[in-house]
């Protein structure tokens, strides 16, 4: 079937979804029985789906999540220590709309990073801006940015996202400068965006990570006292792999 001029106009207007649906309708004789409004509605619905799909791809690419995790893959039976009622509330994403924070703690292999990425993926699907960083590398990036004039711009980019994931907090003590960098991030986002922090350390030991006690007080005051908390223990949180091979089991030796 030769291309229809309307198809070409839709493409020129950037209405790719409508153009695809239009061509599909031309090849389906049964569509002729539909009213004009019904056919137009199908075209508009297809365009909306197409745009939502593109936005999700863009959101996920920008988020740069460490793991390809989704909340649907959570194995609640293996999730020992997980507050399932709280996680169900977190999965709705309402807490992000209220600009609240989340702290996830537990030993290596309990699925901290996986859970954080799963919630980040859900936020992307909810059309929210998300950004993932490992704390050690982010602090290195801020140190480099301070030297080449990008420091303020990098801080602004961290402040703008609706959900910032800070993974692997507290692997090593922070210098005074690193503590100040972290305070800048937390202060910029306080009451303006949501932050997920994952750590192997219990929250009660976080103060010890920051060398300067004054900065430690300021960081924890903004981040800890009103945040939701998930304390994990036990085995990995991923579902076992399906026969189709769609799901990859999370290795408890590498899960964080």
Model segments located where?
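Alpha-helix C-capping/helix-to-loop hinge sites
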Residues: 25-29, 77, 145
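Clamp-loader machinery-focused feature within the broader ASCE/P-loop NTPase space
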Residues: 50, 56-89, 97
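Conserved P-loop
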Residues: 82-160, 207
């Amino acid at each position: 079937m030769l291309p229809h001029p309307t198809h070409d106009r839709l493409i020129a207007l950037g209405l790719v979804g409508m153009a695809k649906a239009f061509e599909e309708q031309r090849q389906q004789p049964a569509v002729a029985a539909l009213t004009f409004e019904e056919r137009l509605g199908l075209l508009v619905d297809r365009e909306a789906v197409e745009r939502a799909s593109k936005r999700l791809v863009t959101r996920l690419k920008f988020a740069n999540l460490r793991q390809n995790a989704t909340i649907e893959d959570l194995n609640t039976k293996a999730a020992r220590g997980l507050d399932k009622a709280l996680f169900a509330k977190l999965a709705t994403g309402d807490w992000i709309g209220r600009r609240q924070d989340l702290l996830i703690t537990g030993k290596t292999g309990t699925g901290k990073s996986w859970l954080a990425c799963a919630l980040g993926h859900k936020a992307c699907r909810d059309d929210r801006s998300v950004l993932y960083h490992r704390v050690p590398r982010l602090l290195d990036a801020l140190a480099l940015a301070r030297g080449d004039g990008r420091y303020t711009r990098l801080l602004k980019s961290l402040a703008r996202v609706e959900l910032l994931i800070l993974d692997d907090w507290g692997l090593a003590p922070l210098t005074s400068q690193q503590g100040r960098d972290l305070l800048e991030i937390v202060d910029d986002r306080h009451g303006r965006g949501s932050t997920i922090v994952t750590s192997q350390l219990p929250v009660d030991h976080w103060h010890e990570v920051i060398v300067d006690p004054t900065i430690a007080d300021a960081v924890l005051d903004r981040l800890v006292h009103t945040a939701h908390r998930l304390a994990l223990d036990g085995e990995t949180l991923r579902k076992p792999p399906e026969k189709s091979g769609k799901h990859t089991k999370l290795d408890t030796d590498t899960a964080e």
